[in-house]
UniProtKB/Swiss-Prot annotation:
Its EC number is 7.3.2.5. It comes from the Bacteria. The gene is modC. This is Molybdenum import ATP-binding protein ModC. Residues 292-358 form the Mop domain.
Length: 363
């Protein structure tokens, strides 16, 4: 458990952060200048709060009242930066072993072979960094940080310098880290796609403060947080399981608490647990079940709430069993449908609107 109570003034900018981050991946998300990198650098010991405290699993790293301020090398934290920062004169193996050599053998909790296998870098061990692609360099940097046996792994926009293809290469490895190695991760990003793929817990930062924090699914489905999560990111994040594939039609079926969704053919095996994003703008509402319609996902639902978003849009929350969907419709549509809480309706979701990138494995 990472516990933060941080205050610092930098010119006109005031940072005032209180946050507890447990197991899994906690994402710090916010606009540029909201204070995300300042927080992670204070945790790492690269900058100093004016006052407050930092502790990991009850071990105090910083406390302004008692005068505790451990240097970075004594904090047992791994840090992955935007740039790989590998040693150019060492091979990949040498860079990885450097992380291990920082600790006595008895304190090493991670195996070189296990890290190399997870990150898929067996064939790179004898190469120098200059001979690696951007994605390969970042995977090696992640491995070096892991082999320092950190109590928590800090990642400051580790994919920001990569092109889309290299990001797609590295993301699956990061997604497995917390689960395979039981290392909590504090992940800084301004990319909602990355956050939705990786985070268990979301902390929304705004103006130097944590404006809201909690389970990813809860925060992403809250219309009141739209100014922080982004208008075009609005929607539901739900858990599901791959229940079947149909190669003849090129589709997969995903079972969730509330029904089954048809999506484009997934490469994930039957039984795989996934996280699924459904944009609020991609859901339609019908009062009666439609007849002979091309939309494959027609889900019985109950209206939970209806609230104006602006002069053009209305936010509607639907319940399909215990699962909530956030839907955006026009004010004209609301005037014609006259939706009210408790009304029975049908949610319509085109299979084509659920992109492959919106379905992520959580196994």
């Amino acid at each position: 458990m990472l516990d933060l109570d941080l205050r610092r003034r930098q010119g006109e900018f005031r940072l005032d952060v209180r946050l507890s981050a447990g197991p899994g991946v906690t994402a710090l998300y916010g606009r540029s200048g909201s204070g995300k990198t300042s927080v992670i650098n204070m945790v790492a010991g690269l900058s100093r709060p004016d006052e407050g405290s930092i502790s990991v699993d009850g071990r105090v790293l910083f406390d302004s009242r008692s005068g505790i301020d451990l240097p970075p090398e004594a904090r047992r934290l791994g840090y992955v930066f935007q740039e790989h920062r590998l040693f150019p004169h060492l091979s990949v193996r040498g860079n990885l072993e450097f992380g291990q050599k920082l600790l006595p053998s008895a304190e090493r909790t991670q195996s070189l072979d296990k890290v190399v296998e997870l990150l898929g870098i067996e064939s790179l061990l004898d190469r120098r960094p200059a001979k690696l692609s951007g994605g390969e360099k970042q995977r090696v940097a992640i491995g070096r940080a892991l082999l320092a046996s950190p109590r928590i792994l800090l990642m400051d926009e580790p994919l920001a310098a990569l092109d889309p293809a290299r990001k797609a290469e590295v993301l699956p490895f990061i997604a497995q880290l917390a689960r395979r190695f039981s290392v909590p991760i504090l992940y800084v990003s301004h990319s909602m796609d990355e956050v939705l793929r990786l985070a268990d817990t979301l902390a929304l930062m705004d103006g130097g403060k944590v404006a809201a924090s909690g389970p990813l699914e809860s925060l992403m489905g809250d219309p009141g947080l739209r100014p922080l999560t982004g208008r075009y990111e609005a929607g539901a994040v739900i858990g599901a399981v791959v229940s079947s594939h149909d190669s003849g039609f090129g589709i997969s079926r995903l079972a969730f608490d509330g029904g089954t969704l048809i999506v484009g053919r997934s490469e994930l095996p039957v039984g795989a647990k996934v996280r699924l994003r459904i944009h609020a703008r991609d859901v339609a509402i019908a009062i009666e079940p439609p007849d002979r319609v091309s939309i494959r996902n027609v889900l019985p639902a109950i209206v939970v709430s209806v609230a104006p978003a602006d002069s053009f849009l209305v936010d509607v929350i639907l319940a399909c069993g215990p699962t909530r969907f956030w839907v955006q419709i026009t004010t004209l549509a609301q005037a014609q449908l006259n939706l009210v809480p408790g009304m029975r309706v049908h949610a319509l979701i085109k299979a084509l609107t659920i992109a492959r990138g919106d379905v992520a494995s959580v196994d």
